[in-house]
Structures are given as structure tokens and as C-alpha cells.
Curated annotation (Swiss-Prot):
Required for the proteolytic cleavage of the transcription factor pacC in response to alkaline ambient pH. InterPro entries: Arrestin-like_C, Arrestin-like_N, Arrestin_C-like, Arrestin_domain-protein, Ig_E-set. Residues 279-304, 697-709 have a biased composition (Polar residues). Residues 710-723, 733-743 have a biased composition (Basic and acidic residues). The gene is palF. GO terms for biological process: cellular response to pH; penicillin biosynthetic process; positive regulation of penicillin biosynthetic process; regulation of secondary metabolite biosynthetic process; ubiquitin-dependent endocytosis. Disulfide bonds: none annotated. This is pH-response regulator protein palF/RIM8. It comes from the Eukaryota.
Length: 775
């Protein structure tokens, strides 16, 4: 982009400028320097003259208003005629290239007094886009002092091309202030300020481009005059030749035009081809493919194989992008054989530029009904013929600049003989917008995406094509769900760094046999209104979800315990974070006021990670550690009043499915559980994924008469507590037995009639050691 610069002399302290020049003039002894110094001091009535916009680094759009100040420092009284400022845009094409590092030719000024005008071609590769002029000061005498003149001007509301400056031309927007004095020598004094303008291109309005379909048909070789036929195994992977039968052969009309001796791999339905394969680009895969087969059969000497057609379909999912975006591309191939190529697909983003030194538009303004006058490309000869020349110079030039490139593998499934490739290419961050709105298309810049597919899979065999794979940029690849699967390109730095030298030239590859190429035009814009709307909606929905989740985390609905959970098969409730194999009861959601005295019942640890809840209020480190420990433990089963017992004593008993003896959970070596009235007590176990009420054969459904106390914390939890916070052992379980008798969850208790059968997860006595957890 073009930076804003000021062409006038800027001086903050005018006195220091004069004192710094006086020693230099005293050191010079030449007569010429003395005259030059005297002439210079005569014109030093105005020392500083510059334009200062309020926002000098801003990029403007058509219709925007630009405000600023014209500063004028007068050291001697001076008379002026007027002081004006003009805002204008100009397009200029240079005749020769400007080497890098050299100053381009001056755009020049059209001079004051032209007023407000529109686009106009001035000839010789110069055209104006618009002009607007405002008078800041009239005729008068300016005394010593610093003068600041405020101005406010606006760009035209119609579309304008973006600012750009390159080696063959420029599109510039400038603020030019001109001071006119009533003298004959140097009557005007002017200064300029370059303004950066961007064309307002909204990419949300561009529809996705139509997919391009390439059909590759095998065509048999034409028989020679001597009647010799080629062997069937010749070029078997690429051609399919059929010998005509003796009884019914295909005759060819004699009035057909002669074939060209030069082989060609591009042919259409109306031309002949000597190559073994030909392809045509169609828009409708169904109708055009069939018509292409019929045309190929009618124009060939021998019938072609209809089932040997190779179809490649390329899709660019977006027609407009912004600088720095990623453009997704989808390629679908229906092949006749299995092909594996690590670099079978080459995608290149390039910029095509076109400049015209003599556009075919009339010179001057034709608003008054004047006859249009066109510029001659070349001087007229004596015969009166114009536009004839024997030289090699051209009025227009077209050039291409490759910006980024990515490779994708081509692997055809041997079962279905199809390949679906999803890849992408990144737009460089410093790419300027598409430019097409200059008068007469004097300067045009368009962007294209070229997709080259090697259908034979032999692109990697010649080393002259791909000598340096590690220097070629690799774009982002997308999985089937649309997510990026290439971790090396997450920052996108490898894409924009590979410019020019490290990009493979595909001109020679496109000429190879079995290689097809399609081109899509994409528009690089400056804004996307649809993306802004979606981001605003997403932010509003996120804020609403946060407001909805805040009261839910602190309170529990009364019907929460009545929901039925079946492990991972149950979906998460709206507004809750998804948890795996976990259901929180009311006691788990309401965190205790004193975390040191835990009142929760801990169950055997089950694998799976749970998201850590965010603390609702500031807490000390010990409380935060205990809360983190509680998130690692499984939850209590919900209390279902329909499935559980009706008595209050039975409601205090935890329930769990009884697992058989041969289950792998017996390897955990739980200690025998306590017996109540000769029956084995039960401890909470893993919840079944099929049903909460799992009945084992041979068990009884009679409930226990007395409730058992809650199970103690397992050894793993105690070790974690000792290592992390050196906490003491939990309180006496017998003291909490009577207080917590009615607060436990309720569910039917199942036990085995046989006294010898042990249940998994039984509660241990207070004086016994806790069961040891072993993997």
C-alpha cells in the first residue's frame, strides 16, 4: 500500500533553519553561491507550508470525509491572491518500468481553478478520477505569524479503485494546496499530501462460483494406411484401443479435414486429436459427459470405451475473501484405476495484472455533446493510416505474479475408484484488494486460483518438475468435518513467507499428458458484512448463555432428582456442560460452606475427566484443593421416587447393580462388607449404562431392615489428601450415622440369598483398612 507522504518542506522551528544555513553560506567562497544565497533569501517570506490531516494514517473509503489543517508560516509580510486546496484522484501508466529503489515519475498537479469534475482521460496514459476544490483564503496581505486554515472535504460516493503504486503505474489520491502570489516569477507555491483510499468491496454479496468439471476420455490411436494395428498392451494405463470386427467396421467419411501432425492434449468435441487422451471442460456433468462421449466416438476411427471415462470436479467454496483468510477447495475424482501421488494436486494463487497505456476511450469531457476525440496509438503516416507499425512495442501488457502455492496428495480408493480431496490455500495478509474500476481498464489487478490435477499420478517421477519439495509452501488441509488437520500451518507463517522463488512454475506441468487444469477467479475485498453479523449474533448468544448458566450453577431445580440418567447414552441438558458417565445430585451441586468437613459420600473412582467448575466466590487454597478433588470423584445416583422404595429407612440406603463373581471388577480385591441381619450390605458401584435397576439372577428384592452407614473414602482419596494438604482423617463414621440416616439416596436394595456370595463394593468396618485400589 502507499504510505501518506508530504512533498513540501516541513520545519518546526523556522529560526533554526535560517541560522543553520548562514554558516554554510559563509564557508562558500564561490560567486555563484553568493548569488544563489541572495536569491534564496528573497523567496524566504514563507518558510513552512504543509498539509496536516487529522488522521494521517487512516485508510478512507468512498464517501468518507477527510478533515485537516493547512499550516502556513510567514516570516515576512507577503501579498497573496488566493489559497486553495483540492482533493483529486489520478491514474497514470508509465512507459517504462521503474526499477526498485528509484523514485517514480511525479504524478503532477492539474493546477488550480478547475473546480469540481468527474473522471476524464487526458491522454498519454494519464486519467483523472475526480476533482474537488475549496478556497481557504482570498486576496490580501499576510503579516508575520503562523496561519492554520481548517478544511473539510469528502470523497465521491461512487466506487473508486484502491490506491496502489508499482513499477508500471500508480493510482493516487492527493490533497494539493496551492498558494498564488501576484508576481511574475514563481507565482504559485504548492504542497501535496498523499491519501490512502480503499475500494468498498463487500464479499458477502458474491455467490460461490460454479464447479468446473473436466472429462478425460480415452481415444484409440488412428490406424495407419498399411493397416497395421498397435499391440493391445501399448500404453495400457492411458488408452483403450479396440480392433474393429471384420463384419461390422466403422467407416470414416472421406471429406473430413486432415489432422494436424503435432500432438495435442487439449481437444473439444468439434476437433480431431492424435493424443491418447483428451479432456473438455463442461458445466453439467450429466448431460455434457454423455454428449462428449458421442462426439468422440463419431470423430474417431475406432469406437472408444465408454466405461473408461475419468471425471475430475473442482469446487471453490467461496468467491470472495479477505486478506489473511483461508480459501477452501474441494476436488472429486472418478477414476478408472488406482492412483497414488503424493503431490498429485497443485493449487496456486496468483495475481494477474493488465496495464494499457492507450485505452480506447475518448479524450477530454464529452458531457457537452462534443465529438469524441480518440488518441492515436501510433503517429499517423503520410498515407493517413493510423495504428500501423512495424515495431514490437505494445500499448497493453499482461503479467502474472504467483502469491502462494499448496500441494495435496491424490489417492484413489481402489474399491470405489474415487477420491475426495479437501484442501485450502491461504490469502497473504499484504494482498491488496481487486482493482477493476479504472477508466478504460488502464490498470487492472485480478486474483485467480489455479487447480492442476495429475490424473496419471506420474508427476513426481520427473525430478525436473519438483526438485525442492521442502521449499514449497503447504497449505491447510481439512478433514471430513471441516476442521484443520495440518498442525504446522496453524499460524499461517509458512504460507506468506514463500514468495516468488519457492513457488513451482506450473506452465510446463500443464502441458504434460494426463494433467488437467482449471482456473477460478476470486475477489479479494475489504469487508464482509455477513461475517460481522454472525460474530455479533455469536457474541450475543454467548452472553445470553452465560446469564442463563449463572443461576443454574448456584441453585437446583426441584425436579432435578427425578431425571433418569443412563450413563453416556443420555444427552446433556440445555445450559449444562456435557459430562461423561456422571450425574450430579443436589448435594454435589450445592458446595458446602465449610469444605474442611466433607459430608459427601465418595464412590470408587471411575476413569474419565470432568471439567473443573469455576468458583463462585473467592476461597482459600485449601478449599480450592478440596473442590478440585471432589470433581475427580463420581457422583451420587439420582433419587428416583418411582423406582425407589417408599419407606424412609430404605430411602437412606445407597443402591448399585450387583455384579457377578466372574466380573473383572473382582480384581480390585474389595474387603468383605458388613452384614446386617445376616445379609450382606451393599456399597455404591459403577452405574450400569443400560439400566439403573439391574437385577442379578439369584438375588432377593427384600429390603434391609436397618440402614448401613455410608462408605468411607477409598485409599486413593486419602493418599491424595495426605500429599496435597496433609489433612487429618475424616470424622467418626458412627457419629455421622444417625445424623445422615435420612439424607442418603434411596433405591431398591438387591442382595444374594446365599451367604457365601459377596457383593462388590461393600462397606468396611471403622477399624478395618480401606480397600486397596489396583489396576
Amino acid at each position: 500500500m502507499v504510505r501518506a507522504t508530504c512533498s513540501c518542506v516541513m520545519s518546526v522551528n523556522p529560526l533554526s533553519a535560517q541560522t543553520s544555513a548562514s554558516p554554510l553560506s559563509r564557508n562558500r567562497s564561490s560567486l555563484l553561491s553568493k548569488f544563489r544565497t541572495q536569491l534564496g533569501q528573497r523567496n524566504r517570506a514563507i518558510t513552512d507550508f504543509y498539509i496536516e490531516p487529522d488522521d494521517p494514517w487512516r485508510s478512507y473509503f468512498p464517501g468518507d470525509v477527510i478533515k485537516g489543517t493547512v499550516s502556513l508560516t510567514v516570516v515576512r509580510p507577503v501579498r497573496i491572491t488566493h489559497l486553495v486546496i483540492s482533493l483529486h484522484g489520478i491514474v497514470k501508466v508509465f512507459k517504462n518500468n521503474v526499477p526498485a529503489g528509484e523514485t517514480p515519475p511525479d504524478v503532477g498537479s492539474l493546477g488550480p481553478g478547475r473546480g469540481r469534475r468527474g473522471a476524464e482521460y487526458l491522454g498519454n496514459g494519464v486519467a483523472t478520477l475526480f476533482e474537488d476544490e475549496v478556497v481557504l483564503c482570498g486576496e490580501g496581505r499576510l503579516k508575520e505569524g503562523i496561519y492554520k486554515f481548517r478544511f473539510e472535504m469528502s470523497f465521491p460516493p461512487y466506487p473508486l479503485p484502491s490506491s496502489i503504486s508499482f513499477e508500471r503505474g500508480t493510482i493516487s489520491y492527493m490533497l494539493t494546496s496551492t498558494l498564488t502570489k501576484p508576481t511574475t516569477m514563481n507565482p504559485t507555491l504548492s504542497c501535496r499530501r498523499r491519501i490512502n483510499l480503499l475500494e468498498n468491496i463487500d464479499i458477502a454479496a458474491f455467490p460461490a462460483p460454479k464447479p468446473r468439471v473436466v472429462t478425460l476420455e480415452p481415444i484409440s490411436k488412428r490406424s495407419k494406411p498399411k493397416g497395421k494395428t498397435k499391440a493391445a498392451g501399448f500404453d495400457a494405463p492411458d488408452t483403450a484401443s479396440l480392433e474393429p470386427s471384420a463384419s461390422g467396421g466403422i467407416t470414416v467419411p472421406e471429406h473430413r479435414p486432415p489432422l494436424s501432425p503435432a500432438p495435442s492434449n487439449v481437444s473439444s468435441s468439434s476437433r480431431l486429436s492424435n493424443s491418447s487422451q483428451s479432456f473438455q471442460i463442461v458445466t453439467d456433468p450429466g448431460s455434457t459427459a454423455s454428449s462428449g462421449v458421442r462426439n468422440s466416438e463419431a470423430r474417431s476411427n475406432t469406437p472408444s470405451v465408454t466405461d473408461g471415462i475419468i471425471t475430475a470436479k473442482a469446487e471453490v467454496l467461496r468467491a470472495g475473501v479477505l486478506p489473511g483468510d483461508t480459501l477452501p477447495i474441494k476436488i472429486t475424482i472418478n477414476h478408472t484405476k488406482q492412483v497414488r501421488s503424493a503431490h498429485g494436486i497443485i493449487i496456486t494463487l496468483y495475481r494477474s495484472g493488465r496495464i494499457d497505456l492507450h485505452p480506447a476511450i475518448p479524450m477530454g469531457s464529452t458531457a457537452n455533446g462534443k465529438k469524441p476525440i480518440y488518441e492515436d496509438y501510433y503517429p499517423r503516416s503520410r498515407t493517413g493510416l493510423g495504428g500501423l507499425t512495424l515495431g514490437t512495442s505494445r500499448a497493453s501488457s499482461v503479467f502474472r505474479k504467483d502469491l502462494s502455492q499448496t500441494f495435496a496428495p491424490l489417492i484413489v480408493d481402489p474399491t470405489t475408484l474415487t477420491a475426495d480431496i479437501k484442501t485450502s490455500i491461504r490469502i497473504p495478509e499484504d494482498a491488496f484488494p481487486t482493482i477493476t474500476r479504472t477508466p478504460g481498464s488502464m490498470i487492472n489487478f485480478r486474483y485467480y486460483v489455479e487447480v492442476v490435477v495429475d490424473l496419471r499420478g506420474k508427476l513426481t517421477s520427473p525430478e525436473r518438475f519438483l526438485p525442492r519439495f521442502n521449499l514449497v509452501s503447504s497449505g491447510r488441509n481439512f478433514s471430513s468435518n471441516g476442521k484443520i488437520v495440518h498442525p504446522a500451518d496453524t499460524n499461517g507463517s509458512a504460507i506468506t513467507a514463500n514468495w516468488g522463488d519457492n513457488i513451482l512454475d506450473t506452465d510446463q506441468i500443464r502441458r504434460e499428458k494426463g494433467v488437467v487444469a482449471v482456473i477460478f477467479e476470486v475477489v479479494i475485498g475489504t469487508q464482509d458484512t455477513q461475517r460481522r453479523k454472525s460474530e455479533a449474533r455469536r457474541m450475543s448468544s454467548t452472553a445470553e448463555e452465560a446469564e442463563f448458566q449463572q443461576p443454574v450453577e448456584n441453585s437446583v431445580d426441584g425436579d432435578y432428582a427425578g431425571h433418569d440418567y443412563q450413563g453416556s447414552m443420555a444427552g446433556p441438558e440445555p445450559g449444562y456442560a456435557p459430562l461423561e458417565n456422571t450425574a450430579y445430585g443436589p448435594d454435589q451441586i450445592r458446595w458446602p460452606d465449610y469444605p474442611e468437613q466433607s459430608e459427601h459420600e465418595h464412590y470408587p473412582f471411575q476413569p474419565g475427566t470432568l471439567p473443573s467448575p469455576q468458583p463462585d466466590e473467592p476461597m482459600d487454597e485449601k478449599a480450592r484443593l478440596r473442590r478440585a478433588e471432589q470433581t475427580l470423584l463420581p457422583s451420587q445416583p439420582p433419587c428416583d421416587p418411582e423406582a425407589g422404595p417408599s419407606s424412609a429407612v430404605e430411602a437412606a440406603m445407597p443402591t448399585a447393580p450387583v455384579l457377578p463373581e466372574d466380573d473383572h471388577l473382582n480384581d480390585y480385591h474389595h474387603l468383605p462388607s458388613t452384614t446386617v441381619n445376616g445379609m450382606t450390605g451393599m456399597a455404591p458401584a459403577l452405574m450400569s449404562a443400560e439400566s439403573v435397576q439391574t437385577v442379578i439372577a439369584g438375588s432377593s428384592s427384600a429390603p434391609l431392615t436397618s440402614p448401613s452407614r455410608p462408605s468411607e473414602e477409598d485409599k486413593q482419596e486419602l493418599e491424595r489428601q495426605r500429599l496435597m494438604m496433609e489433612a487429618s482423617a475424616p470424622g467418626d463414621p458412627d457419629a455421622r450415622h444417625n445424623d445422615r440416616a435420612d439424607d442418603g439416596p434411596s433405591a431398591p436394595i438387591f442382595h444374594d440369598d446365599d451367604d457365601d456370595q459377596q457383593l462388590v463394593g461393600g462397606a468396611a468396618n471403622g477399624d478395618e483398612l480401606l480397600p486397596r485400589y489396583q489396576r
